[in-house]
Amino acid sequence: MKTSVVAVAAVLGASALVGMTVAGCHSGSTSSPASSGSAASTTASSSAASSSAQAQPADYTELLIKATDINAPEVFTAGPPMQNPNGKAGVATSFSNPDGTHVIGDTILVLPDPSAAASALDAAKTALGGSVNGTPGPADIGTGGTTVSGNSPDGSKSVTVLLFTQGRAFTTLEFDGPANAAVPPDFVTDVGQKQVTAIKTGLPD
């Protein structure tokens, strides 16, 4: 399953933010000297905790909407979910109609906090031009809702992108279809609102 250019840009932006946060924590931290035995114990405990976290990554599948949430004339079918797209905490999937002419990509990144999610959204906004020709505008979906609709840069298909955050989750919804036939705004709003509800339920603040 292909992850959208917009979602990838958000991942890169979030990575930079997390890197700066970690670096800042290390450079500004002070601690009293500890005995070598205590340090070794702390290191061992940290390593064990890290190994445990890596062995049991979080499954965010329940944050996704279901195919039955998509109210359309045709039946949409969900593809298999992708855990941790591009190596970042979260989940992604796609929904398509029977002949594959309409596809909805749904990518949710779970960040450390709402501020990091907002930064990921800002990074994604700068990459919108790589996916769709159009002027972004506000959308009353989640926090910082932004939408843009038009044809893809090569003119081969219509693309509508909806970006928003909900708590510490950042979501990219991309609606692809035939060229010059963008999906109706109310359809985008309906899917977006259902995705907000699913995140609120599965990832409480």
Regions found by a protein language model. Name each.
Residues M20-G24:
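C-terminal motif of bacterial Sec signal peptides marking the signal peptidase cleavage site
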Residues K2, C25-S94, P178, P185-D205:
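N-terminal "mature-domain start" segment
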Residues L111-S115, I141, T165-G167:
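A short, structured loop/turn motif at beta-sheet edges
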Residues M1-G13:
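Bacterial N-terminal signal peptides that target proteins for export
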Residues A92-L121:
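A short acidic-to-branched-hydrophobic micro-motif
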Residues G105-T107, R168-G177:
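Short, well-ordered beta-strand elements
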Residues G90-N97, S158-Q166:
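Short, surface-exposed beta-strand/loop micro-motifs that present aromatic residues
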